[in-house]
UniProtKB/Swiss-Prot annotation:
TM stretches of this protein: none
Assembly and binders: Heterodimer of LeuC and LeuD.
Keyword Lipid biosynthesis: no
EC number(s) stated in the UniProt entry for this protein: 4.2.1.33
UniProt xrefs under CDD domains: IPMI_Swivel
Coiled-coil region list: none
Pathway per the UniProt entry: Amino-acid biosynthesis; L-leucine biosynthesis; L-leucine from 3-methyl-2-oxobutanoate: step 2/4
Catalytic reaction annotation: (2R,3S)-3-isopropylmalate = (2S)-2-isopropylmalate
Species for this entry: Bifidobacterium adolescentis (strain ATCC 15703 / DSM 20083 / NCTC 11814 / E194a)
Pfam families tied to this protein: Aconitase_C
Name of this chain's protein: 3-isopropylmalate dehydratase small subunit
Record's keyword terms, sorted: Amino-acid biosynthesis, Branched-chain amino acid biosynthesis, Leucine biosynthesis, Lyase
SUPFAM superfamilies: LeuD/IlvD-like
Length: 229
């Protein structure tokens, strides 16, 4: 996962509260089997309106989303964060986030920065005065700077540490790779009758044998060949 320490980019004012995950990405797009390519689905219904903020040329390259309170409520679809990230947003600022959405942001390289609603209103005012304006978010200092205005934001220490180091869940697990390998080696020696759980890439290719073939001496082949299915 890409590290996030300081980000300077176009800030987009989203003057809407109670934005739920179905508004961020409709359920119809959840049928996709990949984790990327959801940028076209972000705010899909709203983007059909020519006046929607993301349809304005000055916000096409938005990287920082300044949203209203209670952002990311609703169902716990991780796709909502994927869509924001794929579109280009690395930071979402709000006065309140849904808990599950907040947790998903850190796992996917997106900062959910919490600021008082008064600070959000001030940022909206500054952005309305100069559409397409850039802001700087410093995760190291926990500040947002827009022009001459610098405001603090909240982020817990653990989330800050993950984002600044670019650690997703797999990265965190691999920090204990030596311990995992040692345990699996011990497990294989002590309990040889149990299946191994090492990654497939560490195992030689094994021939696949039918369990039925060993269980039934009269096994004649696939069920289809025997007229059973």
């Amino acid at each position: 996962m890409e590290k996030l320490t300081t980000l300077t980019g176009v800030a987009v004012p989203l003057r809407r509260s109670n934005v739920d995950t179905d508004q961020i990405i409709p359920a119809v797009f959840l049928k996709r089997v990949k984790k990327s390519g959801f940028d076209d689905a972000l705010f899909y219904a709203w983007r059909r309106d020519p006046e929607f903020v993301l349809n304005k040329p000055e916000y096409k390259q938005g990287k920082i989303l300044v949203a209203g309170p209670d952002f990311g409520i609703g169902s716990s679809r991780e796709h909502a964060v994927w869509a924001l990230h794929d579109y280009g947003f690395r930071v979402v600022i709000s006065s309140r986030f849904a808990d599950i959405f907040y947790g998903n942001t850190a796992k996917n390289g997106v900062l959910a920065a919490i600021m008082p609603q008064e600070s959000i209103e001030l940022l909206w005012k500054l952005l309305d005065e100069e559409p397409g304006r850039e802001m700087t978010v410093s995760l190291e200092d926990r500040t947002v700077t827009c022009g001459d205005v610098t405001l603090p934001f909240e982020v817990n220490d653990y989330t800050r540490w993950r984002l600044m180091n670019g650690y997703d869940d797999i990265d965190l697990t691999l920090q204990h790779e030596d311990d995992i390998i040692a345990y699996e080696k011990m497990r294989a020696e002590k309990f040889p009758f149990k299946p191994k759980t090492l990654p497939v890439k560490r195992e030689p290719e094994q021939p696949i044998e039918s369990a039925r073939e060993g269980e039934y001496p009269d096994w004649q082949g696939p069920l289809a060949d025997r007229g059973i299915i």
